[in-house]
């Protein structure tokens, strides 16, 4: 019996030690511990809501202790209320450093930071940084030279390339400010005003296509091509073409792989069927002949509609006959699809969402005008309407002559620029979530807000894309 009493005292001592060190006692959950039992005391007081009781066994026998533990209620026992001990609370840095000198605190913090961060894995660091929002990433680069040099790191470039692509940005030229571009970031709903110093200042240069974070520019005289990353100012002037084309041309761009490190291709095609392909790896234009004879010449392209790229294939919109012209950058094959457009349609352009080919246009009946979205059905080669702008927004266009420009060549986000004599609107449409969002006006430097986009292209922002 003495051994049992000693073990019980040891148990009580351990519990008291736990209480003294700050560990919370287990809550009383047994229904037998009630106020009706003389051997146990349960206090219900605001000050002791978490209080609990232990028997005082200094003056009791082992039998009494066993009776208390095993047969509560048969014999009276003496109890001692222990002071309520709250769970440990995390102290603030000010409380932890209270009473220490500034030198001691700085030494502790410095040693702690050095010990933690000097062993931080570089691959994990790059993996975290690659997931930062683009605007935050460029602020992050200003911290030190090492972080600024990340965009030149091959491992960081691979890490960034493996991430799923985010919603695209839009490089635009406003109607009255054709000498500089404005970039819209839909995630922040903010306009940026990048400067690409290498672009010629004396001629008008327009954005024509994009791939992998790079934007392809063409001067208004159709003489020179340029490729640049608007975020990092990486720039390349493409070599002169093998022959001059003075007519209007359509321009498309694709990647050779999943990033610009594998190279990219640029295609231009003229109305008479002539075309050339530029490969960044060889840095030359290749003349691959003319469009096959089974495709009607002249090629009447809808130049308001930008070509869209799905994998390695470019799609152009035809006006006569109505349909789509495609070119595979890998196989070099042209195809033509006769696809009649929806009736009462105007200002229509192609758009892409993943592997889906979309059509965006103005549908006008009587005096009512609305923006509609169609998707090409691959089995029937017919356009199927999948969405249209909310009616309350369409009412703004009632009785007005509306014109529209559309940028939707990358990602699943489409930027619409709508104007009439009385109004201008900028709107984005998400083809995945089917959300319509109004876009704030673009404030041109030293100018007022502009709500009309003359031309532009969508592109996926990339800090690692190199021209």
UniProtKB/Swiss-Prot annotation:
InterPro entries, sorted: At3g26010-like_b-prop, F-box-like_dom_sf, F-box_dom, Gal_Oxase/kelch_b-propeller, Kelch-typ_b-propeller, SCF_F-box_component
PROSITE patterns hit by this protein: FBOX (PS50181)
Domain of life: Eukaryota
Kelch repeat start-end pairs: 163-211, 252-305, 406-456
Biological process, per Gene Ontology: leaf vascular tissue pattern formation; regulation of auxin mediated signaling pathway; simple leaf morphogenesis
Keywords: Kelch repeat, Repeat
Coiled coil: none
Domain F-box: 114-163
PANTHER family on file: BNACNNG10540D PROTEIN, F-BOX DOMAIN-CONTAINING PROTEIN
Name of the protein in its database record: F-box only protein 6
Organism: Arabidopsis thaliana (Mouse-ear cress)
Name of the coding gene: FBX6
């Amino acid at each position: 019996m003495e051994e049992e009493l000693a073990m019980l005292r040891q148990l009580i001592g351990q519990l008291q030690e736990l209480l003294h060190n700050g560990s919370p006692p287990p809550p009383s959950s047994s229904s037998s511990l009630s106020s009706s039992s003389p051997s146990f005391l349960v206090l219900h007081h605001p000050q002791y809501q978490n209080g609990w009781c232990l028997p005082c066994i200094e003056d009791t026998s082992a039998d009494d202790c066993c009776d208390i533990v095993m047969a509560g209620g048969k014999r009276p026992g003496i109890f001692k209320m222990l002071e309520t001990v709250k769970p440990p609370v995390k102290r603030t840095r000010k409380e932890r450093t209270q009473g220490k000198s500034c030198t001691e605190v700085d030494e502790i913090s410095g040693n702690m930071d050095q010990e933690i961060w000097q062993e931080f894995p570089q691959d994990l660091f790059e993996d975290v940084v690659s997931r930062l929002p683009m605007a935050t990433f460029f602020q992050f680069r200003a911290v030190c030279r090492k972080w600024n040099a990340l965009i030149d790191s091959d491992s960081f470039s691979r890490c960034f390339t493996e991430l799923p692509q985010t919603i695209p940005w839009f490089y635009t030229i406003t109607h009255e400010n054709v000498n500089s571009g404005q970039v819209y970031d839909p995630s922040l709903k903010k306009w940026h005003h990048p400067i690409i110093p290498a672009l010629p200042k004396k001629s008008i240069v327009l954005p024509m296509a994009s791939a992998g974070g790079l934007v392809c520019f063409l001067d208004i005289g159709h003489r020179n091509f340029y490729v640049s990353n608007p975020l990092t100012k990486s720039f390349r002037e493409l070599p002169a073409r093998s022959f001059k084309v003075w007519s209007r041309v359509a321009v498309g761009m694709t990647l050779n792989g999943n990033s610009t490190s594998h190279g990219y291709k640029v295609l231009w095609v003229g109305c008479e069927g002539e075309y050339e392909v530029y490969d960044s790896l060889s840095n030359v234009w290749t003349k691959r002949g003319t469009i096959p004879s089974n495709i009607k010449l002249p090629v009447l392209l809808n130049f308001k509609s930008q070509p869209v790229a799905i994998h390695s294939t470019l799609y152009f919109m035809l006006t006569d006959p109505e349909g789509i012209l495609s070119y595979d950058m890998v196989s070099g094959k042209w195809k033509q699809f006769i696809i009649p457009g929806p009736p009462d349609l105007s200002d229509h352009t192609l758009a892409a969402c993943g592997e889906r080919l979309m059509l965006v246009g103005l549908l006008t009946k009587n005096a009512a005008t609305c923006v509609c979205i169609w998707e090409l059905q691959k089995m029937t080669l017919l356009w199927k309407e999948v969405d249209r702008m909310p009616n309350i927004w369409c009412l703004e266009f009632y009785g007005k002559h509306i014109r529209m420009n559309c940028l939707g060549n990358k990602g699943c986000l489409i930027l619409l620029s709508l104007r009439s004599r009385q109004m201008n609107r900028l709107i984005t449409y998400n083809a995945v979530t089917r959300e319509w969002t109004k876009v704030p006006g673009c404030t041109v430097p030293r100018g007022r807000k502009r709500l009309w986009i003359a031309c532009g292209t969508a592109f996926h922002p990339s800090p690692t894309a190199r021209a």
